[in-house]
């Protein structure tokens, strides 16, 4: 994966266009599909590919929880979980597990029946889109419905490469939701990803409410500059890979 990603970056550095890099990415995706058919011992390759192909479209939704029922008619979690795990173990996707409550220790609150899926390579996420959507994202910089999922994927990829196990929280019957969490000593740090430097209501609630005793401060990633206000550290999205070093 790292060699292939380097080839994409090198091509772009030479040509300053996406034509060559996109061709490389398309070939990587083609190779992935071939590997699925070749190495999916004991699993249905069609099911694995259906999950793989559906990741970008589920990230485009407002509710980014991955819904197996949307992958294929009659699809059920118990029939597809092995496919999801296969893709994760192959280094193709990243699983972000739901928490039943944002509290330490995180492992005691993980619910693997609910999760979000991100592509392990954000460039390949964009390459999976159709031609029109790719031109919107790459050329016109018009992210539209892809903005939230794309920025979340960028941050998720950086956190995983920094050794963070991904988890998120969505409170039932509420708008309270948090994209990621990070443990720093005895603190549980919520991490929210914003397309712009917008207000982070969920972050404020988690920090100020007495119902979340492990949470005292948080991090907000934005398409903007560094700042710190009301116990919220604001960072540009590109710096996500530095987060464990910054807060550790």
Please provide the spans of the model-predicted regions.
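Residues immediately flanking
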Residues: 122, 193, 223
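Short, solvent-exposed amphipathic alpha-helical segments in soluble enzyme
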Residues: 133-134, 207-210
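Domain-level recognition of nuclease-like catalytic cores that cleave nucleotide substrates
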Residues: 224-248
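Active-site-adjacent loop/helix micro-motif of nuclease/hydrolase catalytic cores
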Residues: 197-206
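Switch/connector loops and helix/strand junctions flanking conserved nucleotide-binding motifs
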Residues: 127, 200-201, 227-231
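Nucleic-acid nuclease catalytic cores
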Residues: 171, 213-233
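Active-site ExK catalytic segment of metal-dependent nucleases
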Residues: 188-198
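Accessory nucleic acid-recognition modules appended to NTPase machines
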Residues: 2-185
């Amino acid at each position: 994966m790292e060699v292939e990603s380097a080839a994409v970056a090198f091509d772009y550095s030479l040509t300053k266009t996406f034509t060559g890099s996109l061709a490389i990415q398309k070939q990587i995706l083609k190779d992935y599909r071939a590997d699925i058919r070749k190495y999916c011992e004991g699993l249905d390759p069609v099911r694995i590919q259906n999950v793989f192909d559906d990741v970008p479209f589920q990230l485009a939704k407002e509710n980014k929880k991955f819904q197996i029922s949307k992958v294929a008619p009659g699809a059920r979690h118990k029939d597809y979980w092995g496919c999801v795990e296969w893709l994760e173990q192959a280094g193709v996707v990243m699983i972000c597990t739901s928490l039943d409550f944002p509290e330490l220790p995180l492992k005691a609150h993980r619910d693997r029946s609910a999760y979000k899926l991100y592509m392990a390579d954000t460039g390949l996420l964009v390459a999976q889109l159709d031609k029109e959507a790719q031109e919107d994202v790459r050329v016109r910089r018009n992210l539209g419905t892809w903005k939230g999922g794309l920025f979340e994927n960028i941050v998720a990829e950086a956190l995983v490469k920094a050794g963070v196990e991904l988890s998120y929280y969505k409170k039932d019957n509420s708008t309270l939701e948090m994209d990621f969490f990070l443990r720093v000593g005895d603190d549980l740090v919520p991490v929210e990803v914003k397309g712009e430097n917008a207000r982070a209501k969920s972050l404020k609630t988690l920090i100020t409410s007495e119902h979340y005793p492990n949470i005292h401060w948080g991090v907000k990633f934005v398409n903007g500059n560094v700042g710190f206000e009301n116990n919220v550290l604001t960072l540009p999205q590109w710096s996500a890979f530095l987060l464990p070093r910054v807060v550790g």
